[in-house]
Amino acid sequence: MFAPTRDEARRFLVDAWKKHRAGEPLSPLEHKAAALVGLHPEYHDVIEHPERHLERDYGPEGGEVNPYLHLSLHLAVAEQLDIDQPPGLRAQFERLAATRDEHAALHALIECLGETLWQAQRLGTGPDATVYLDCLRRRA
């Protein structure tokens, strides 16, 4: 399993976007990452200027969003949807997407994934697919 460090994950996003903007060939995962960065112009300055942002710690104080974490969760959700893991995720996403735009539906998945990961960390367990899917059902 690929388990990058914080810096490796951040550098991956920066490099994928840089290659995309330069018109260089991208791996399938880099293509997904670049497309997700493209959906978030509010993060372009962060991604395009790693010398200013790569080492920065983002805290929840003041409602600050960690753009690297947000994009990494987007990427995780995209991978989950590709393989319908956990089973039923794609169907839940389609229900959500039927009631809002696709990007908003993706954000609902990200929020539920974040809640599921937070709960697993708090309890000292692995992520619970039932908790994840139940969260999505409540949002549909």
Model-flagged regions — what are they?
Residues L29-L96:
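Aromatic-anchored, charged helix-turn/loop surface patch used as a conserved interaction hotspot
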Residues W118, R122-A140:
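Glycine-rich, aromatic-bearing surface loops/beta-hairpins
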